[in-house]
Amino acid sequence: MSKKSKKSKENQKVDQLETSHKDGAGQPLTTRQGLKVNDTNNSLKAGPRGATLLEDFLLREKIHNFDHERIPERIVHARGSAAHGYFELYESMGKYSKAGIFNDTSRKTPVFVRFSTVAGSKGSTDLARDVRGFAVKFYTEEGTWDLVGNNMPVFFIQDAMKFPDLIHSVKPEPNNEIPQAASAHDTFYDFVSLTTETLHNHIWVMSDRGIPRSLRMMEGFGIHTFRLINEKGKAHFVKFHWKPTLGVHSVTWDEAVKISGADCDFHRRDLWEAIDSGQFPEWELGMQIIPEKDEHKFDFDLLDPTKLIPEEMVPVKIIGKMVLNRNPENFFAETEQVAFLPGNIVPGIDFTNDPLLQGRLFSYRDTQLSRLGSHNFHLIPINKPVTDVHNNQRDGHMQMEIPKGRTAYFPNTLGGGCPHMTSVDDGAFTSYQEKIDAKKIRARSDSFNDHFSQPALFYRSLSEWEKEHVISAYSFELGKCKEQSIVERMLWLISQIDKGLAKRVSENLGLDIPSKIEKPINQAIGADTKPSKNQPPKKKNYLESSSALSQSNTVFDSIATRQIACLASDGFNMSDFKKMKKALEKENAIVKIVAPHGGTIICDEDMEHPVDANIATTESVLFDAVLIPGGQNSIEALMEHAKFTKFVREAYKHCKAIAAMGEGSQLIDKIEVDAVREDDAILIDGTAKDFINAIAKHRNWNRMEKAAKIAV
């Protein structure tokens, strides 16, 4: 049995998709009607130089199809990458939920996961500073469940009514369609400065979470509070978390800008190549479970999507693992046409009254009609459930099935009463019977008003190097705004989060922090709402810090899939290279020779070695660490190329590990920083073990002050 067929047996969804695959290998070219084509290079003409004839149906079909190949891109999350995989449960959660996916540990539930940026268009860079979408489609035996989340646990806004305003503000400005995939402009900060509920998510975006090293190295969150329902009908509130086994790691802003120029498909390529090489990305699924009786015990509202529950208050219980082990066969058919709907749930999972979630339940289904062209988008192969589907919903554009029988209604006798309804005991879905005693009102709960405490908690929880990155991000973003009044309002709001943060940003901008701003502070209120209503109170300090919020507390135990650039030319020391390469690859790192030219280079033992990257076509920002084997001829050749010196200096600037052996240390000295050899992540004739440990730490952020002086 081939590796591919063995894999497919583990994944019911992939088996289903294979029935829709088309493979033209060894087949003749035909029209859409099956007519074999003799010439697809020339149109039908009245003579070789004559007019093209209208009767040329081959030309018309080919051009007609080309004219209609594209579909509208997603309004948000247009830029995406996806993969197939499976989810396995560690232990039964039947105490909390009757969902089969949370009870049966023998199942391998097929999943399709799409990662995305929010603001940019389909062709924008992967490395924009932005929230990342993290949407998981579970093809369960009880129906499809979509957990449509992000890589940040909180959202910008509290109510879906504000979503069009948010997106209109962050998208390119309508008068000139500038800037693309960027929040650093006036309309966005005009909105944020007047809508203070945005401040928590915004500081997450300003942190390193906004520019992840890899899609495989970021967390995922369900954002909303959902309900779990067990067999007895008892409910618990739940927040969903995805924890990457490789840890949570990011790049610097300088790297992100340069990666966007060197390889704007960096994240997409990284995900594809990792899966293609058998280094399958993994996340563990965790739950924060809260009894219904504890709904109001916190200093924040569980229904507020701009708030998180600190893990110190409610620990995350790890319940299972997701593995992505197969790339899509076709980007358009799968990644582009997949439709995620928060309204896709299964028995044992239910909604809450989160006002953002409630609006998403409508919006995600509604948008598919214009994007995919029909309400029958569930018949597109990637969207089809693996369970049998039988109902009385009929017809419409692009109906792909042929329903049998006379009846399309219920109740009926002519169809034997089928398809029949199912009792709850036999697996039918029923909504949770929540008691409701309220007046119909268009208003915001006062329990949603605290807009400063959690962003302050987030900032306090960061390490010093993370705080420096936040300061730089705010300084860059606000520095791009042209309206000083907007910037000053933002500075005042930041001062309510942390005065030290605001002071540093204001100094970088050359502006004073205003002592007061125009009231109401939060202007996202109704016309007849009292100006004092829905205003943020002064921040509370109900928790000094939360370790889970800082990337300095993530996993640092692996160099798997890390990209190591080996700088070498003719005459490089084979012994140095071979020894280090063997140790690195044993830990599943990827070592690539970067040389002054393509083709091959010859080592000091007169053996040829293929070059993986020509220095003219690559950059240091595409690698995690640098290896410089000895060999005087090799080092002299490298130092003749200014770009190799730049490569090493830039790797140092971005706080990466660099190992040099023998004469390779001469390139280290080109960094031209005092005591550079005393750096913990600069290894001169060090051991492979020491180099591996330095790479596993991701970066040596202790060198940031010195690194800032490096000009590259």
Model regions: which residues?
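Glycine-rich nucleotide phosphate-binding loop and flanking beta-alpha elements
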Residues: 572, 633-635, 665-667
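Short amphipathic alpha-helix with an adjacent loop that forms part of the alpha/beta core around
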Residues: 615-622
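Short glycine-/acidic-enriched loop or helix-start segments at secondary-structure transitions
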Residues: 576, 637-638, 668-671
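Short, conserved catalytic or adaptor-binding loops enriched in Gly and charged residues
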Residues: 672-677
